[in-house]
Amino acid sequence: GAAGTAGTEDVARPDTPDSLCGWIDDDTNLHVWENLGVRGVWERYVDDWCRACESSLNFDVMAHPDLVMRFSKEGFAPDFDPEPLWEQMAECAHDTGRRVEVSTAAPRKGLDDYYPATGLLRCFAHAEVPITFGSDAHRACDICWNIREAQAHAYDCGYRTFDIPHATGEWESTPL
């Protein structure tokens, strides 16, 4: 569930006037980045992402594993090797049985990679974390945008299958 929905009473809402947490992809308010610095934002994001993986809420897919890359072209690119954090995320997703969404949103928003970035997707592949695909479409014209290229990208990162959800709640693994 999203912040503020049933079962998530303890989840901080970043969009309230009294919130001190902010949000990492709000381009109207960069105080989180300015206060914590790039490394601090990354570390907090990875910790929170792993806590979400470990949640007892009923969901299967973790999306935007490296949304933290959103402002990399605006002066907030990591000045450190993120691989240890990526490995932590891959281990957490694997150990909790979560799938990861490969999203076409990043290239659509002008970034040079996908969500997750190539290095992180390779870590997920190495850890045998299942994947599914999405486009994070907020408009009809973006549904399945660049999806074939995203599938080829996943193949290049080591994946040979991806999972498709069914209305029954079951998942089907299919070849790339």
Predicted regions, residues:
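Charged catalytic cores and adjacent phosphate/nucleic-acid-binding surfaces used
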Residues: 5-11, 20-21, 75-176
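Extended substrate/RNA-proximal surfaces in nucleic-acid metabolism proteins
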Residues: 1-96
